[in-house]
A protein has these predicted regions:
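Topological signature of polytopic alpha-helical transporters
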Residues: 172, 180-181, 185-186, 196-200, ...
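Q-loop/switch helix immediately C-terminal to the Walker
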Residues: 313-330
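Helix-to-loop junction immediately C-terminal to a conserved catalytic motif
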Residues: 274
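Conserved ABC transporter NBD signature motif
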Residues: 56, 71, 185, 282-290, ...
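Membrane-spanning alpha-helical segments of multipass transporters and channels
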Residues: 454-457, 525-779
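ABC ATPase C-loop
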Residues: 375-377
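Conserved ABC ATPase "signature" region
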Residues: 337-354
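Forkhead-associated
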Residues: 18-91, 133-205
């Protein structure tokens, strides 16, 4: 049964603290620290009773407790309660007591945390969810998710041991205990900082403020407003305007659609509202708080579903969401807790029957639901979607929009950027952007066409493009609709422009090692589920090895040695580069979103390097063994430079394949479209053949020689040629290369240069990945 919001709010005082009970919520009473009203008495059951609303009044229900629940002196199973009710738990005379009274009426002039930009307009800070006294005898108040804390916060975004509030002679200090998502003071991450009255301590979805000797808790339940004020974005040194003075309010629990012709600034507005690319001028107020100023904290409460899927399509729905939960929740979150949350969002979005299916096998609408489920894991208050119905048929379009309507009704603010006008009627508000990034309309969807003077949306969009002289924005500003829906609905005063914002600190992430392990498991699972990729990975080294073996014959001779080594080089380059050349560009959207919520750049890259590196090295070993097994190598005295000849050649091929893999990652990070990777792979192979030293005389040729130093196959062929002393077997000018000498120093130089090239490529990939990150956090 859903709670009844028409019932009055009540204040319950129990166990030395007080809680204002919101009629839209259910309150659990018992010894369970995760409950809303916690009683520390052995006579009280773990789950003792429930307080909830029903048909406009409050209802007390006993949950089959051992020692009973007593209202006004008599034992009850369930009964109506209200202001003046006295409830005892566990014993009718001296059991823990809860007294109910009417909640104090919020006063607009009541003190609010000073770090809120506009306290009078905020909903979260209008009334504390709970008030807890801070006894001076206890100098440390421990805050976290674990039951043993002094202040238990039932939120998976909160670590089990999250923070401590320390009382000292000079006041209070907040100390972060190495939490997953961080502790924030007035929106900024802190490790240790002094707290004064009016400051906001942010922990998960909760905010705490000191008021005298009390700690007031304010919970962000998701019902938050958004106020957009005078956003402007300019490019080309101010010569071109993408957004021009965009202002509008978005109420709690509402669904807003943003439409407009191409080039009207829809994507620019989305980036500005989410904080990914802040506007050059103006402000975005999240429930009275400056989003850009407090972005480090508030970004955890923002969900963004891009147009492209943000999950690995080879994985099943349940498995993909499970890996996402491991990355987004604290490392100390129990597996059962994560799985419970995954199952909850799967059920909420109607995906229970599809949970074991691979994502790529789902319909477009179902895949979009999975992407939404990913964002709902962390219970965001604001949910943004970019073109969620793109490519869907009208039925699926309608289904997705009704899903978003339901998400808003459940207590979220949902903003969707779309080109589809089929289901605008389910939205509360519609924002129409005209070319130049100006507001042509904001208000109820049903009034939009009448305001423009058209009967169909295609006519309106054609007019936007054709009638460029018409002042669409000016007409709207002069209309009664602007006064009613923008000037009238906006509850927050104009926000003064602040100084330009620099990059914020990177999100406080799960431990680097924990992220790396999760990323490696997920990547290995995705690779193993891609059957086509597996077949290619297995077949390629055998095919190239067989070609090398056919050329080598039974022995490396004057006629076969150079060609056999060349084929090994080509095979290693193709194997390594083919493994990696698509891996970063195809995950561009996934990386951008995960980086924004705390993914470590280096852990992400290292997961690719380690998993692909292991696969590539195994392939290189197979390639060499197939190519040279049983072949007489004709090394001097049957020995290599430092080790047996076959071992040295295998090491050279493996290191070349690894370096080629790093080169493939570099190309994948460099390009913007997956389609161009295959032509570039062919080009890479040609360059390796030309500059390896097997076809052209490079030593002593100005320009070509220096250019060849950047080509991995040049050094790998040198190492292999040195192992067998190729100039001795093939005595010609081409093999009289200084890098082909059978000397330990030369062989080690060849191998060392492959390592150096790998490291340089890794550094370059890291810098290129930085380009894909949200602009506000690049550093």
């Amino acid at each position: 049964m859903r709670p009844d919001a028409s019932a009055p709010a009540l204040l319950v005082e129990a166990d030395g603290g007080s809680v204002v009970m919101d009629p839209r919520r259910t309150y659990h009473v018992g010894r369970d620290p995760a409950g809303e009203v916690v009683l520390h008495d052995a006579r009280v059951s773990w789950h003792h009773a429930v307080l909830r609303t029903d048909h406009g009044h409050w209802l007390l229900e006993d949950e089959h407790s051992t020692n009973g629940t007593y209202a006004n002196g008599r034992r009850v199973e369930h009964c109506d309660v209200g202001p003046g009710s006295v409830i005892r738990f566990g014993n009718p005379t001296d059991g823990p007591c809860a007294v109910l009274s009417g909640a104090p009426t919020p006063r607009t002039d009541a003190p609010r945390p000073s770090a809120v930009s506009y306290p009078a307009a905020t909903r979260t800070f209008r009334q504390p969810s709970s008030v807890r006294p801070l006894p001076r005898a206890a100098r440390t108040t421990r805050i976290g998710r674990a039951p043993g804390n002094d202040l238990v916060v039932d939120d998976l975004a909160v670590s089990r041991r999250h923070a401590e509030l320390l009382a000292g002679p000079d006041g209070y200090e907040i100390v972060d205990l190495g939490s997953h998502n961080g502790t924030y003071l007035n929106g900024q991450p802190v490790a240790r900082a002094a707290v004064v009255p009016g400051d906001i301590i942010g922990i998960g979805h909760s905010a705490f403020a000191l008021v005298g000797e009390e700690l007031q808790e304010f919970i962000d339940t998701g019902e938050v407003s958004l106020d957009v004020q005078d956003l402007a974005v300019h490019v080309d040194r101010g010569r071109k305007t993408l957004l021009d003075g965009v202002s509008f309010p978005v109420a709690e629990k509402s669904l807003l659609a943003v439409v407009g012709p191409s080039g009207a600034g829809k994507s620019t507005l989305l980036n500005a509202l989410t904080g990914l690319k802040p506007a050059d001028h103006g402000a975005v107020l999240y429930d009275g708080r400056d989003l850009y100023r407090d972005y480090a904290e508030l970004r955890q409460r923002i969900g963004l579903v891009p147009q492209d899927d943000i999950l690995h399509s080879q994985l099943t729905v349940h498995r993909a969401l499970g890996y996402a939960a491991r990355l987004r929740f604290p490392e100390d979150t129990a597996k059962a807790e994560r799985q419970a949350r995954v199952d909850e969002v799967i059920g909420e979005l109607g995906l229970a029957q599809r949970a074991t299916q691979p994502i790529h096998s789902l319909s477009g609408g179902q895949r979009k639901r999975v992407s939404v489920a990913l964002e709902l894991l962390t219970k965001p208050s604001l949910l943004f979607l970019d073109e969620p119905t793109s490519g869907l048929d009208p039925g699926m379009d309608r289904s997705v929009m009704h899903m978003l309507r339901g998400l808003a009704d459940d207590g979220r603010t949902v903003i969707v950027v779309t080109h589809s006008v089929l289901s605008l009627d389910v939205c509360d508000r519609l924002l129409v952007l005209a070319p130049g990034g100006r507001i042509a309309y904001y208000g109820p969807p049903e009034e939009a066409l009448r305001f423009f003077g058209f009967t169909q949306w295609p006519e309106a969009f054609e007019a936007f493009e054709a009638d460029s002289v018409r002042d669409w924005a000016g007409q709207y500003r002069a209309s009664p609709l602007h006064r009613r829906y923008i000037a009238g609905d906006s509850r927050q005063p104009r926000h003064a422009p602040e100084a330009p914002r620099g990059p914020v600190a990177a999100p406080k992430a799960q431990s680097w090692g924990g992220q790396l392990r999760t990323l490696m498991r997920r990547y290995a699972a995705a690779l193993s589920a891609d059957r086509t990729f597996l077949i290619i990975m297995v077949a390629l080294p055998f095919v190239m090895g067989a070609m090398a073996h056919a050329l080598a014959g039974r022995s490396l001779t004057r006629d076969s040695a150079l060609n056999a080594l060349l084929i090994l080089c080509v095979g290693a380059v193709l194997t390594g580069a083919a493994n990696a050349v698509r891996e970063l560009v195809k995950e561009r959207t996934i990386y951008q979103r995960e980086r924004a919520v705390g993914l470590s750049r280096s852990a992400y890259l290292m997961s690719k390097v380690l998993v692909l590196g292991a696969v590539t090295v195994v392939q290189a070993v197979v390639l060499t063994m197939v190519g040279l097994f049983g072949v007489r190598l004709n090394a001097p005295a049957g020995a290599g430079v430092l080790m047996p000849p076959l071992v040295e050649i295998t090491l050279a091929v493996a290191l070349l394949a690894f370096t080629a893999m790093m080169l493939g990652l570099f190309v994948s990070a460099l390009v913007r479209k997956e389609e161009v990777t295959m032509p570039l792979l062919v080009l890479l192979a040609i360059v390796q053949v030309v500059f390896c030293g097997a076809l052209l005389k490079l030593s002593g040729t100005p320009g070509l020689e220096q250019l060849s130093w950047l080509v991995p196959s040049r050094w790998a062929l040198g190492a292999m040629a040195g192992t067998i002393d190729l100039h001795r077997i093939v005595p010609q000018g081409l093999t009289a290369d200084p890098l082909f000498q059978h000397r330990p120093g030369i062989w080690l130089l060849d191998m060392a240069m492959l390592i150096v090239l790998s490291l340089v490529l890794g550094f370059l990939v890291t810098r290129l990945l930085r380009r894909r990150e949200p602009e506000i956090m690049r550093k």
